[in-house]
Amino acid sequence: MPARPASSTTRQGALAEDRALAYLQRQGLVAVERNYRCKGGEIDLIMRAADDTLVFVEVRKRGGRGFGGAAASITLTKQRRVLRAASHYLATLDRLPPCRVDVVALDPGRLEWLRNAFDLGALDSEGGGEGPAS
C-alpha cells in the first residue's frame, strides 16, 4: 500500500522545524536529534550548545498572532509531553549533561527563541501524571 501524502499541517510543521533548526545552527548549536518520540511524548529538536548543554527544543508555528501567538499555544499538557520525552531521552545517556528546554516560536514575519522556556524540574513535582481529564 503506498504511503499517504503528508498533510498540509505536517508539511507546515516540518518547514517550521527546518527554519528553527537552521536558525539555531547559525546561533552555534549543533543538531543531535530531530523528532524524538517515545510513549507519551515527543521533542521536535534536540541540540547541543557550545557549553555542552543539551537543549530540548519545542517548535511552534502560528499563521496569525491571534490568541497570543505561537509561544502562547504551548499548553501544560504539551509541556508535560516534552518533559516526559526529555526524561526518557536523558535515561538513555551514560552521563547527564546540563540541559534546558527552549521554544522557537514562529509567527508571521517573526522568529522568537525563548531559552529556558519551561523547567525540567517540573517532572519531579508532577509525578508524571496527566492530571484529571477535562
From Swiss-Prot:
Single GO term (MF): nucleic acid binding
HAMAP family named in the record: UPF0102
Organism annotation: Cupriavidus metallidurans (strain ATCC 43123 / DSM 2839 / NBRC 102507 / CH34)
Entry's family note: Belongs to the UPF0102 family.
Name assigned to this protein: UPF0102 protein Rmet_3430
Pfam families xref list: UPF0102
